[in-house]
Design a protein with these regions (language model features):
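Conserved functional hotspots at enzyme active or ligand-binding sites that engage polyanionic ligands
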Residues: 1-110
Length: 110
């Protein structure tokens, strides 16, 4: 199995979910530093959706087979080895840098 690292896209089901949370077997991108994924089975992921909504924290995927937008305001911590997942692909360095820069804004004091 391919090692999950920062920038990896996987498909995984996080059901059961509630309310407006993303449901079903769907793509997620790993945002945790690769040191975290190397020594732990737990990492922070953002869901990927084909939403049409424009929002500063919904970042379109470019340069990938996976389509949609990364929903940076819906981060989840996943124990990915406790669930059935499938590695899909890695994003480009440029896209990963863009995602990480936007995620930092979510945690700034405001």
């Amino acid at each position: 199995m391919v090692s999950i690292k920062q920038g990896s896209i996987i498909k995984i089901s996080l059901d059961p979910k509630q309310g407006h949370e993303q449901k079903g077997y769907r793509p997620y991108i790993c945002l945790s530093h690769s040191v975290v994924t190397k020594y732990s089975n737990i990492a922070i992921f953002a869901p990927i959706s084909n939403t049409k909504r424009d929002y500063p924290f919904y970042v379109p995927l470019k340069g990938t087979k996976t389509t949609g937008k990364v929903l940076l305001d819906q981060l989840v911590t996943i124990d990915f080895n406790a669930r059935d997942y499938r590695y899909v692909e890695d994003v480009t360095e440029g896209l990963l840098d863009n995602l990480l820069a936007r995620v930092k804004v979510l945690f700034e004091k405001g």
